[in-house]
């Protein structure tokens, strides 16, 4: 039976599957051990050597591990249940397999033993970063890098040269049954011109339209998108800059008002949709931000609707705008937040969470704190309104119960309940 590689995803049609871990306990007493029967298959699904998850179990359990690569036996000392190991495998997948950006298990590890670093690159979204090497398993990985690691490039080049030499030799022998006599020692026999052309053809084949079309037929639709878009191979900062130039150009051309769909499509193409509000605030907002919130509400709503991450970037963008127009905007923070809240660009939870911690990532620490101090009246109002609404919900539940029971009662009783509801509504508005 197969399970999702990322078990936090409950979709039964999730494309990334792996076999469920099968563990077999062998031996007795001090010699008891757990053999992971299908570790090779599990590791293949994760695109990692089978020694990595086995060693991870040993690190987490404080147990010794044994690897019998020839017989495909991977052993953890002690008695351990399969379900326990399966849950522990989720930790390994999260730390060493899933991409931190898109959470897809399409990553490769790049080990540099000299610098003692382990890089991580994602083939799905183009993410590149470094792993935290504090885990004990990282020491094992640095000593035993995977075969596809950059540390093995020298070995690969040698194999490539050897292959190339063999191809030349095979080509020269195939022309006749007996090889030609060797040239005199003082003469150098250059390779025939036809062979050079063949080699050039081999190297140039990748760039021809026919070769590209043939390769495109062999790869999946998802990989097609990545291959066709070179921009996805760039860093996040470069992709955000591309989006910034795109939005700025639309504004300069005077078509920004009707370009909301195009801007969202471009952000999705670059895989930086959550950061879209940060770009929009920089291009579209100035000291007249309160008027501009209403004018460009549709643009921001396409990014921020039901997207808390995008809403957080909108708040960070607001901080940047305040930093540029501090004299005009610092006193208007509560009103600006209220405008954004009323426009459904921000949710209560996101605003309250933002107000609790000042960050110096986008503006200075002092300004970030000052902005939050100025926002306190609105935050206080927001919290009080939330408490009142929760209290009102409880009252509504009681009223609903009254109405349900009043169906069995006489008509005058139902009318009385309705009149009470109206009075309650008036009281809530007054509050």
Curated annotation (Swiss-Prot):
GO terms for molecular function: cadherin binding; eukaryotic initiation factor eIF2 binding; GDP-dissociation inhibitor activity; GTP binding; GTPase activator activity; RNA binding; translation initiation factor activity. It comes from the Eukaryota. One of its GO terms (cellular component) is plasma membrane. Residues 143-216 are annotated as: Disordered. The modification Phosphothreonine is found at residue 227. There is a cross-link at residues 413, 418 (Glycyl lysine isopeptide (Lys-Gly) (interchain with G-Cter in SUMO2)). The record marks 15 as: Arginine finger. It is found in: Cytoplasm. Belongs to the eIF-2-beta/eIF-5 family. Component of the 43S pre-initiation complex (43S PIC), which is composed of the 40S ribosomal subunit, EIF1, eIF1A (EIF1AX), eIF3 complex, EIF5 and eIF2-GTP-initiator tRNA complex (eIF2 ternary complex). Interacts with eIF1A (EIF1AX) during scanning. Interacts through its C-terminal domain (CTD) with EIF1 or with eIF2-beta (EIF2S2) (mutually exclusive) through a common binding site. Interacts through its C-terminal domain (CTD) with the CTD of EIF5B. Interacts with FMR1 isoform 6; this interaction occurs in a RNA-dependent manner. Component of the 43S pre-initiation complex (43S PIC), which binds to the mRNA cap-proximal region, scans mRNA 5'-untranslated region, and locates the initiation codon. In this complex, acts as a GTPase-activating protein, by promoting GTP hydrolysis by eIF2G (EIF2S3). During scanning, interacts with both EIF1 (via its C-terminal domain (CTD)) and EIF1A (via its NTD). This interaction with EIF1A contributes to the maintenance of EIF1 within the open 43S PIC. When start codon is recognized, EIF5, via its NTD, induces eIF2G (EIF2S3) to hydrolyze the GTP. This is Eukaryotic translation initiation factor 5. It comes from Homo sapiens. The lineage of its organism: Eukaryota, Metazoa, Chordata, Craniata, Vertebrata.
